[in-house]
Amino acid sequence: MEIEKTNRMNTLFEFYATLLTDKQMNYIELYYADDYSLAEIAEEFNISRQAVYDNIKRTEKVLESYEEKLHLFSNYVVRNQLLEELMKKYSTDQYLITKLQEIQQIDEEEF
């Protein structure tokens, strides 16, 4: 499994988990976050490996679809980049730095 894909799926899961069904959440979390194999998940839920595989693939598409429509992850990345740039450019303005850090903290608390 590619590390980049794993990281992306874990991140998309963090942003959109509440939009998934319980079954989708369980399979994705076990597969990507907990590094279970398809066989281990299948055994855990007493279903076939193929059923687990199909569900995970469908859920990956669902997560990508949510990101395509809502842009929560990509907007989060852009916001953080902009905040970092502002902190560097105005590093001597303590009031501004404090306010930027507050914004950053709010963003991080949400996810």
From Swiss-Prot:
Might take part in the signal recognition particle (SRP) pathway. This is inferred from the conservation of its genetic proximity to ftsY/ffh. May be a regulatory protein. Belongs to the UPF0122 family. It comes from Lactococcus lactis subsp. lactis (strain IL1403). It comes from the Bacteria. The gene is yofM. This is UPF0122 protein YofM. It holds the Pfam family UPF0122. HAMAP family: UPF0122 (MF_00245).
